[in-house]
Amino acid sequence: MYVRVNAYILEGTNHLNPIASNSVKLNVKPYYIELKDAVPTMWYLVGNMFGAKWANDKNIGVDALPMFLKPNFSYDKKTGAGEIEYTNYFLTGDYNDKAECDGAGFKILPSDFNWDYSMNAILNNEISAKKGTIENRNGGADGGHIVASEAGYYTITINTADNTAKMEKYEGNVTNYGTIQIATSLDDFASDTPMLPYNTEGVENHAWYYVMEVPAGQTVSFKFKIAGSWDTNWGYGAADGAINMYGKCEANGHNIGLAEGKYVISFNDITGAFSIVKL
């Protein structure tokens, strides 16, 4: 490719004293960048409802638990914005004079763990908050702990495009499995490994998580199941080993694949949703 520079003095519409440089030959090497969809935006549950873990170390899967990507939701390919959710049993309790609630209180943090933009309960005044409410702090004054209006099953939904949130009662049927296991191809599905519960306050739990590290150069498959039996198990995908980062599991579905890396895998035994966050 050849290029040159043309210059002139502009006077009104006239081009005065035009001059052109010598031509210069350039060798151009095409450069290809594969465009990838943005990773969906995630928020993290912290607080007394979740073992009094407040993300002090900003350690996902340890002191901050991911919400769930929504099955069949089309996330914005450029920004990753969309809806995320979390369904489980929630305790309730009374606020202290700091709008905090022991045992049942919690907050929700954005992926950068910036408390100035956390999800909190709406304050009535400096010492009390409105149960069952959620709003984004949006850089303003701190809000209260989020607390269910009464004990029971709820779904929390966050729209990460406009950072709005709601907490609604869940009215569907619920089966209590007690524990949920994960089985993997690392030992040819021979053993069960207990997943960890989101709820740690001695109440029913239906959301589970497990931190998995897939060795370099390998792909691992896994399924969710009840303890000691394959009579009840869940999988997902078009074929065994297909890699999917979220979806709604099917009974006796396909093995879910994961490429090398470290992940937090979450599963909800009420909704069947699974969601994976790469660390």
Segments predicted by a language model, with ranges:
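Insoluble glucan recognition modules
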Residues: 1-279
